[in-house]
């Protein structure tokens, strides 16, 4: 089996400086930059609403709740991902079903996804 490695984060000096500015402001959450980000991402995605959350786990959990996953449901997730992906599904009572990923994209294989679909799949 071939190992698929995660990549090094790409963080610019501008990003680092802005994070420093935010930390010095005393508002790590719900400050002016949070509102600005929500406004910009809403505009960029042409969405009616945008909301920030404290972590990817929280965002995934909210997404699973919005998708109305329930006990007895199965949700296909990538086999190579952060544990939060499967945990967010579990928090709703649903069961995560793992599908392998392809090299080099790291995306789930369509063939593997199709083989995992059952009557319980959401």
Segments (PLM) and residue ranges:
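Alpha-helix N-cap/helix-start and coil->helix boundary motif
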Residues: 12, 57, 82-83
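Structural motif corresponding to alpha-helix initiation and N-cap regions
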Residues: 13, 35, 107-110
């Amino acid at each position: 089996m071939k190992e698929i490695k995660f990549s090094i984060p790409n963080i610019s000096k501008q990003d680092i400086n802005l994070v420093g500015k935010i930390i010095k402001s005393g508002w790590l959450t719900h400050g002016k930059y949070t509102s600005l980000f929500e406004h910009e991402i809403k505009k960029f995605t042409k969405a009616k609403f945008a909301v920030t959350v404290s972590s990817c786990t929280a965002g995934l959990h909210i997404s699973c709740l919005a998708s109305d996953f329930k006990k007895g449901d199965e949700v296909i997730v990538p086999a190579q991902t952060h544990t939060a992906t499967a945990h967010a599904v579990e928090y709703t009572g649903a069961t995560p079903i793992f599908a392998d990923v392809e090299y080099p994209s790291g995306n789930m294989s369509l063939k593997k996804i199709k083989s995992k679909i059952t009557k319980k799949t959401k």
